[in-house]
Each structure stands twice: as structure tokens, then as C-alpha cells.
């Protein structure tokens, strides 16, 4: 793969963020703006209110209404970040690649595995770097569990339970609620892209998958609002994953049982709400969980709190900068996101 040349090889990586909804505003723009490896040069949004807010928050960025305006500036850019609905990912990423621009695609990667394979092939042919924003690999709780698994203190892991549940019956009011499954909508596409990815990162490739989906929204023809997934890994571990945006009571975030011990964690990672509230990644205490939120490790009768590793979303962009300069691997191999998409497709084929 080609690496950055000229001023970007040493100076800031000139970056454009496409979309300024939850993804662009809460995640990408703050993370990029806080990293000295980057300059946030362009933000694309057609929404007047979002454009005004983007201009207020990032006065040095150029705000343009359309991707066409962005790609007209491609000679002045080094990276494109897509924080748009999944139905747009393929065309926008393909256009960025055609302009020779490295691209970050938010999850879900694309709407079909065929599209994903095509993008990977086009990027390889063009010598352009392509990655996917699987930011939940840098959640505090996931980093903690990954450390415990790596240290083998649980013994042989036999069962892994993972939940992303909350009570939000009104929905998000965006593509997550309104897009059809074929357009990347539904909770399995949205959160399954995270939870399945985490399970594979922990326990390896999947040999069997099964799932159930349900729609509890007022629209009987709408996409799923609840999903359950069961995975059998080559390692022998069984993962069971729950996703529910209408859960009046939530279960533990993680419940992991091994031959020697177990680990249980409640509550969701705090980085997203912190970023949404205006905290920046450079603020003291960013990503640090209070002791009251720590998980417990041990066996019944001998349980003890286990300090959470700091949440670290900024590492995605730090690792990406190194990769773009030829100094390390991409933070997320798009082939791994493609594997997740194939699992989701298999589940949907039989759910």
C-alpha cells in the first residue's frame, strides 16, 4: 500500500469528515481534532443547523454541503472519514478510493459482503488504505476483558455473554430506526457489527452462527429492534450476544465463565456520553471508569472488583496515522469487518 507523501508524511494529515450526525459529531470530529497527527479541514453536511454547529465547533474547517464539493477538493486532502448512513458507504468509499484517498468507513462497513469485498479489492488495486471504525475494540470494559483473557486468569473460557441494552422506546430518529434491513438498518446490523466483532477478536473465527430478531416498533414492516446471536468459535468458546433498544431492565454488559474463574461487568462504556457532553480526549480522566463501575472477578463467595483499563478511542486514529505513514498496521483490517458482515448475513438468512 502507498503511504502519505509530501507534507502529510510529517505534518498533519489533512482530513475530511462526511456527515455530522452522531457519528461525525460525537466520534470522528472530536477524536481527529484532538490528535496532533491530523488537521480537520473539511466537514460535509447538507443540514443547515448541523453546518452552523460544525462551523462553531471547528472554525478552521471548511463546511461544504455535498460529497461532490468534497471530492472537488481531493487534491488538498489526505484522508476521508465516512460518518454517514450505511447505504451510502459503498459509493462514497469507492469514490474516495478512485481519487486516491485513504478512507475510514464507519460501521456497519457496507450493506452486503459483496460490496465489502469489492471495496477491499478496489483499495488494493489502487494502493489505497481502507479501514473500518470498529471503535468498540477500545471500550474500557472490552480492553479489560481482553487483558483477562490474554493473561489466562479465567482458565479455559467456556461461555461468553455480551449485551448492549438500553431503554429508548422512541428510537434514535435517524437511519437506525428508518432504514430497511437491506439498507443497513436494524439493531443486528448496527450493534451486531460491534458485538460480533468483539467476540471474534476475543475468541477467534466462527464455525457456527444462529440468531433471532424481532421488531417491537410501531411500524410492523420496520427493521429489527431486538436481536440475539449465538456463535460457536473454532476455539470451542460459545458466545451469546443480546441487542435491545427497548429493554426496560438491562442485563450485565459482560458475563464470562471459565474453568478457573469468571468476570461480570455492568454498564456501558462512558466514552460516547462523555464525548457527546463536550469532553475532549485530552481532558484529564478521559476514558477512566470510576471504581463503582468496575467489573467483578472470581468465583461466588470470593468476588473482587477488577480495575477497568482506560477507554481508548483515540488509539484508533493514533494507529491509523502510523499506518498511513508506513509505520504500522491499520487499526482495523477491513477483512475482519467483512467476516462480521458475513456472519450477520448468515444469521439473517435463517432468522
Identify the residue ranges that each predicted region occupies.
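Contiguous beta-strand/loop segments that form the cofactor/metal-binding neighborhood of enzyme cores
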Residues: 1-5, 197-272, 314-326, 344-347
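C-terminal helix-rich "cap/oligomerization" subdomain common to oxidoreductases
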Residues: 1-12, 69, 79-81, 304-306, ...
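N-terminal Rossmann-like dinucleotide-binding module
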Residues: 1-58
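Hydrophobic residues in well-ordered beta-strands that form the structural core
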Residues: 24, 65, 105, 111, ...
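C-terminal glycine/acidic-rich active-site capping loop/insertion
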Residues: 35, 255-335
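Beta-loop-alpha module in the N-terminal Rossmann-like domain of NAD(P)-dependent dehydrogenases
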Residues: 58-122, 312
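Rossmann-fold dehydrogenase core element
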Residues: 118-136, 156-162
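Predominantly a Rossmann-like dinucleotide-binding segment in NAD(P)-dependent oxidoreductases
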Residues: 136-220
